[in-house]
């Protein structure tokens, strides 16, 4: 692997301003070789709360919202992208709360002869631990943004922006598209009074 503290011309990074310049080179390498480039223009997303329920998580009453982020597809109506997001926040919070967001891929099929899953840890699931801290949690389904296979690259957000055409060599791939979807979820959090959008992890 290239030395992160050595410029492409072979000179070492000696101080913070030089590191800022070297970081630009590293980001460019990742854009070109790993994740691809986000298009200069991407469509807006309009969020809709499709269901709201109250449930108890780790002994804490939580308000859970199911959301769909409708990606504007007027530029290419043959591809529809609806981003799936779940947001749960404490029902009795006195103000906006921090939120931990994760990617959720749903239950995976298990063979009939698979050993049973281990029980949750004594301190509870991650959602229960977060709820007991008085925080919220969110689960974004990344495959609702972009499928995790090559066949899906003419669909999802990549297919929508490319108007159904296959991606080019340096176009964004699924991981970069998922990050774009997470950023759109952050946009929604900024509009939800239950969420402290400056404290999302």
Where are the regions a protein language model picked out?
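Non-catalytic accessory segments flanking enzyme active sites
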Residues: 2-91
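Cap/lid segment of the alpha/beta-hydrolase catalytic domain
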Residues: 96-201
């Amino acid at each position: 692997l290239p030395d992160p503290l050595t410029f492409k011309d072979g000179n070492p990074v000696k101080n913070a301003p030089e590191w800022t310049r070297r970081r630009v080179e590293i980001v460019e390498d990742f854009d070109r070789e790993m994740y691809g480039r986000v298009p200069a223009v991407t469509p807006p997303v309009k969020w809709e709360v499709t269901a709201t329920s109250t449930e108890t998580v780790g002994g804490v009453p939580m308000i859970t919202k199911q959301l769909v982020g409708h990606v504007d597809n007027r530029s290419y109506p043959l591809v529809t992208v609806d981003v799936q997001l779940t947001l749960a926040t404490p029902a009795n919070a006195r103000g906006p709360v921090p939120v931990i967001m994760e990617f959720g891929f749903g239950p995976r099929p298990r063979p009939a002869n698979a050993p049973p899953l281990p029980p949750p840890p004594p301190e509870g699931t991650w959602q229960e631990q977060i709820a007991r801290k008085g925080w919220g949690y969110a689960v974004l389904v990344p495959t609702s943004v972009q499928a995790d296979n090559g066949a899906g690259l003419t669909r999802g957000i990549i297919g929508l922006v490319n108007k159904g055409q296959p991606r080019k060599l340096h176009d964004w791939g699924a991981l970069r598209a998922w990050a774009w979807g997470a950023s759109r979820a952050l946009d929604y959090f900024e509009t939800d009074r239950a969420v402290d959008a400056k404290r999302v992890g």
